[in-house]
């Protein structure tokens, strides 16, 4: 469950390391879960990379510490809150995705992120 001012790890190689959520996209929404798009500001970044510190970016949430209930009754949760930076078309800005991602991303049409991920849970 991600809300304003929440810090997230970045799960790609775009150059950013930490994001802070400043807005959850959607009409009057307060919380974001796995597969939701947020507006975030880069709080920590590597030098000489495309994404710089204090850049305002779009990102899709790929992991949350808040447990996620599936229709089958299974409950999954991850060890951290993480996001992948995307462009306006919904494609990732990086070329690699680190760590596992949730299967719900495929239902939300983020198939490029799912195909780059090393593990889909």
Curated annotation (Swiss-Prot):
Keyword field contains Ribosomal protein: yes
Top-level lineage group: Bacteria
Keyword Ribonucleoprotein recorded: yes
UniProt xrefs under Pfam families: Ribosomal_L14
GO molecular function: large ribosomal subunit rRNA binding; structural constituent of ribosome
GO CC list: cytosolic large ribosomal subunit
Xref: PROSITE patterns: RIBOSOMAL_L14
Gene3D superfamilies, per database record: Ribosomal protein L14
Record keywords, A-Z: Ribonucleoprotein, Ribosomal protein, RNA-binding, rRNA-binding
GO BP: any one term: translation
Biological role: Binds to 23S rRNA. Forms part of two intersubunit bridges in the 70S ribosome.
Family label: Belongs to the universal ribosomal protein uL14 family.
Assembly and binders: Part of the 50S ribosomal subunit. Forms a cluster with proteins L3 and L19. In the 70S ribosome, L14 and L19 interact and together make contacts with the 16S rRNA in bridges B5 and B8.
Name the record gives this protein: Large ribosomal subunit protein uL14
Native source organism of the sequence: Synechococcus elongatus (strain ATCC 33912 / PCC 7942 / FACHB-805)
Lineage, broadest ranks: Bacteria, Bacillati, Cyanobacteriota, Cyanophyceae, Synechococcales
């Amino acid at each position: 469950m991600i809300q304003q001012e929440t810090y997230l790890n970045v799960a790609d190689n775009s150059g950013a390391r930490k994001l802070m959520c400043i807005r959850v996209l959607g009409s009057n929404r307060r919380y974001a879960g796995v597969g939701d798009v947020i507006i975030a500001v880069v709080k920590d970044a590597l030098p000489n990379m495309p994404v710089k510190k204090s850049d305002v970016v779009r990102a899709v949430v790929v992991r949350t510490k808040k447990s996620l209930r599936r229709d089958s009754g299974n409950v999954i949760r991850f060890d951290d809150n993480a996001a992948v930076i995307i462009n306006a078309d919904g494609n990732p800005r990086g070329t690699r995705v680190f760590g596992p991602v949730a299967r719900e991303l495929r239902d939300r049409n983020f198939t490029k992120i799912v195909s780059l991920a090393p593990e889909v849970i």
